[in-house]
Design a protein with these regions (language model features):
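Catalytic cores of alpha/beta
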Residues: 166-182
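A general structural detector for well-ordered alpha-helical segments in enzyme core domains, enriched
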Residues: 49-53, 79, 106-110, 138-149, ...
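Core AdoMet radical
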Residues: 2-47, 57-74, 84-106, 112-144, ...
Length: 194
């Protein structure tokens, strides 16, 4: 459950069934059993953090969002809006590593305000294999997001960030073939990759 709140329900069920006490202690979550999701919401009640972050907007050159799926977190949008409101967006590059779970028009409208956006789209295969590796993603939705990203503004660069692994190694040629057949205008253009 350290890496994803989606694992918390499974952890609640599985952890009590571990019989080896040494293993059970080793596998204990860092917050010593607090598996209610509270550690994923530390930012919700931390006004001082947000005040200090907003004070730094004039000094920012880049904001990098990796993990936690920024595109589904309201505070991500609030931060981007604060940067735009402060008048510094054209000086700042945005970077993302994301599986593109949700990308509303609001996001693309905000991106238009920034100097540059580099979106590294985490996709590891096609079809059912993608759905399995990137659960709970659905391939049809992933394809839709590919096309939305391919039609973003000129300040947006998009690359596919594929994690080569045992589950997809034999399917990578199919993935590359599919991607090339799409004839995307901007996704992984040379020299960024094929």
């Amino acid at each position: 459950p350290h890496d994803s709140s989606l694992w918390v329900p499974d952890w609640i069920k599985l952890h009590p069934s571990i019989e080896n006490e040494s293993l059970k202690e080793t596998m204990q979550w860092g917050s010593k059993g607090q598996i209610d999701g509270a550690s994923y919401n530390w930012h919700k009640k931390n006004d001082k953090f947000w005040e200090q972050l907003y004070e730094q907007i004039p000094n920012m050159k880049q904001l990098y969002f990796a993990g936690g799926e920024a595109t589904i977190i309201e505070e991500h949008y609030t931060l981007l809006e604060e940067v735009v409101k402060a008048g510094y967006a054209k000086n700042i590059e945005l970077r993302y590593n994301s599986n593109g779970v949700e990308m509303p028009q609001r996001l693309f409208d905000l991106w238009d305000e920034f100097k540059n956006v580099r979106f590294h789209y985490s996709v590891d295969s096609i079809g059912e294999m993608n759905d399995y590796i990137r659960f709970p993603s659905k391939w049809d939705h992933t394809v839709k997001m590919f096309h939305l990203l391919d039609n973003t503004g000129p300040n947006v660069e998009v690359t596919v960030a594929c994690a080569v692994q045992a589950l997809n190694i034999y399917y990578l040629p199919d993935f590359v073939k599919w991607k090339l057949e799409q004839k995307f205008k901007k996704i992984n253009l040379w020299p960024l990759g094929a």
